[in-house]
Amino acid sequence: MSQLEQKLTEMLTAPVEALGFEMVGIEFVRAGKHSTMRVYIDHPDGISVDHCAEVSHQVSAVLDVEDPINTEYNLEVSSPGMERPLFKLQHYIESVGEVVTLRLKMPMGDRRNFKGKLLSEADGMLTIEVDNQEFVLAFANIEKGNVVPTFD
């Protein structure tokens, strides 16, 4: 998570939670002049378009006052979806047993990307099985993670 994403998460978590939603995480994607801020929310009963609009309105109001971003951007509010992004250690713990993709900040040997079954978490270390080989990765070294949807 970048410093900007961390700052935005800290700034927007309370307003999102005050509306009754979980702040799953924030991605800020720079693409030339067209940056996008994605706010992922969740709720035990699911997320509707009306929920996204409500959170978008609240988040926009906070961002208009705080003005933490010095470039133009589009705001997107959505549920995490089937390819649920994993932001917090708790998200990884909840995903043990599922297939995930992980990208590391710093390579492990010559490898930076992993796709496999998340086997366990212990003291901030994640064990993932890729092609019948186990890798133990530090949560602190994970740049990005997502659940891979499986259809059984």
Swiss-Prot record:
Cellular component GO terms held in the UniProt record: cytosol
GO biological process: ribosomal small subunit assembly; translation
Domain of life the protein comes from: Bacteria
Keywords: Cytoplasm, Ribosome biogenesis
Subcellular location: Cytoplasm
NCBIfam families: PRK00092.1-1
Family label: Belongs to the RimP family.
Record function comment: Required for maturation of 30S ribosomal subunits.
Xref: HAMAP family: RimP
Name assigned to this protein: Ribosome maturation factor RimP
Gene: rimP
